[in-house]
């Protein structure tokens, strides 16, 4: 069941216009006792949802939600409200934002039940008559305790670079419209919290808008927001890339696409990709009736815009020419098949011939099972090319481990860097936690496969935050004799 806090919105005329409430709440007028002007349109008739004609209702004093009354769940729907005007007349209002339905009923029995229940609720909670001038009508006004806070949150939320003014006044029922209603109208807690919920007060915090109990609702607005997998905070997607996919709430490093990493590390205008059109041809004819390998490859190509799980090429890092390979976890979990292995091997051989430093950014679940032993052979092939590059040619290879780096990538080129860099909180392992526990029948300690723990065990060199990830390799390259070129 959904509950909506509308009083705060009705007491802000400018916000009401931007959220499109003027059209749907036309019959509701203003009262002289209101602290702020309520949305006030011309008086008009509204069709009754019970089919008994129409009602003209203006000058309504107050609109509130009965979400805090435990026994009302069986009487009212998710968007039903009780209104009492200055004449003492009562109405029940059905309000459906998504379908733009606004209906009014004056069923006396229904309202009598609500009055009785609400009266009991106030007596149970020791409501004070001196606190609220609407007490005689069994209306518990929470305005003074939370209105200022909610209004502040709403105004800053809408005005903060979301450009809502350009898309809402035309009355379109687009997804950003629904988003603002769902989040700004503060769809309150549901599910197991129903039995213990009370009317919201000034204790509401900004972080409540990103609680984990809103996960289902957030799926509808993925094109607008990115939810942190660590703190469940919301990050505005439009600016998320410019913040290097770092959560604004807790600083957690979320996954980045290979294209975003190339943009982060490589100087603008210097990127020259290699072997872009190399794709897998299903070498062992892996067959699955539910999800054929070729169909799966095609779907990931469409979804990511990539041909395979790694991008390789030449570019400049702070003016220093380098060869770089960047794995993309969004493409089949960054799994390493024959094409991934071949592209990385060719990159290393190219860098060997031209004496270029190499960076490999790892993000992989390991070898690709759909290619069988051919995928395992890539571990040896890449390691052999690196041996010639490092031991024979004495060139410099930097491995950057991001979350997650596991399986065959960890067991091969991921751990062969002259300098091994890890990102904060990166998940780095050979076998995953579930595999270890199911195989060895032992419990894996929590956090034992995280970068900070492994750093203390000496598994790699520095842990470098993402905002410094371009500067640190640049200094390392110069220390090893690689300098910027014009």
Curated annotation (Swiss-Prot):
Its cofactor is Zn(2+). It catalyses: N(6)-carboxybiotinyl-L-lysyl-[protein] + acetyl-CoA = N(6)-biotinyl-L-lysyl-[protein] + malonyl-CoA. Zn(2+) binds at residues 228, 231, 247, 250. Residues 224-486 form the CoA carboxyltransferase N-terminal domain. It comes from the Eukaryota. It is an enzyme of class 2 (transferase). One of its GO terms (molecular function) is acetyl-CoA carboxylase activity. One of its GO terms (cellular component) is acetyl-CoA carboxylase complex. It is found in: Plastid, Chloroplast stroma. Binds 1 zinc ion per subunit. Belongs to the AccD/PCCB family. HAMAP family: AcetylCoA_CT_beta. Acetyl-CoA carboxylase is a heterohexamer composed of biotin carboxyl carrier protein, biotin carboxylase and 2 subunits each of ACCase subunit alpha and ACCase plastid-coded subunit beta (accD). This is Acetyl-coenzyme A carboxylase carboxyl transferase subunit beta, chloroplastic. The gene is accD.
């Amino acid at each position: 069941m959904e509950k909506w806090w509308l009083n705060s919105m009705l007491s802000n005329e400018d916000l009401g216009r931007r959220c499109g409430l003027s059209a749907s709440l036309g019959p509701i007028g203003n009262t002289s006792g209101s602290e702020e002007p309520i949305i006030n349109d011309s008086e008009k008739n509204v069709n009754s949802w019970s089919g008994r004609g129409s009602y003209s209702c203006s000058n309504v004093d107050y609109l509130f939600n009965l979400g805090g009354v435990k026994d009302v769940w069986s009487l009212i729907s998710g968007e039903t409200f009780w209104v009492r005007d200055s004449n003492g007349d009562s109405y029940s209002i059905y309000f459906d934002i998504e379908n733009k339905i606004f209906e009014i009923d004056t069923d006396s029995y229904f309202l009598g039940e609500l009055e009785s229940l609400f009266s009991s609720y106030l007596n149970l909670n020791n409501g004070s008559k001196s606190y609220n001038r609407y007490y005689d009508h069994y209306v518990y006004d929470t305005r003074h305790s939370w209105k200022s806070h909610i209004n502040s949150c709403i105004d800053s939320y809408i005005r903060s670079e979301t450009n809502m003014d350009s898309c809402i006044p035309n009355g379109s029922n687009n997804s950003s419209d629904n988003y603002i209603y769902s989040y700004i109208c503060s769809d309150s807690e549901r599910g197991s919290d129903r039995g213990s919920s009370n009317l919201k007060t000034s204790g509401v915090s900004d972080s409540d808008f990103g609680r984990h109990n809103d996960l289902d609702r957030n799926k509808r607005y993925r094109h607008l927001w990115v939810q942190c997998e660590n703190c469940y905070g919301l990050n505005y997607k439009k600016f998320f890339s410019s913040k290097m996919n770092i959560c604004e709430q807790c600083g957690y490093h979320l996954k980045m696409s290979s294209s975003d990493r190339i943009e982060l590390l490589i100087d603008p205008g210097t990127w020259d990709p290699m072997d872009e059109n190399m794709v897998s041809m299903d070498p062992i004819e892996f067959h699955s009736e539910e999800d054929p390998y070729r169909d799966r490859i095609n779907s990931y190509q469409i979804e990511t815009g990539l041909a395979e799980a790694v991008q390789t090429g030449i570019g400049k890092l702070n003016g220093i020419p380098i060869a770089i390979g960047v794995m993309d976890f969004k493409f089949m979990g960054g799994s390493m098949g024959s094409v991934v292995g071949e592209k990385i091997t060719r990159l290393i051989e190219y860098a060997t011939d031209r004496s270029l430093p190499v960076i490999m950014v790892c993000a992989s679940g390991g070898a690709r099972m759909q290619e069988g032993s051919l995928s395992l052979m890539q571990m040896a092939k890449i390691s052999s090319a690196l041996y010639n590059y490092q031991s024979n040619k004495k060139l410099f290879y930097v491995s950057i481990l991001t979350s997650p780096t596991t399986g065959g990538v960890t067991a091969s080129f991921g751990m062969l860097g002259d300098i091994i860099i890890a990102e904060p909180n990166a998940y780095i392992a050979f076998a995953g936690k579930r595999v270890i526990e199911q195989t060895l029948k032992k419990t894996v300690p929590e956090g034992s496969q995280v970068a900070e723990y492994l750093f203390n065990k000496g598994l790699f060199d520095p842990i470098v935050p993402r905002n410094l990830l371009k500067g640190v390799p640049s200094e390392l390259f110069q220390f090893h004799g690689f300098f910027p070129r014009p």
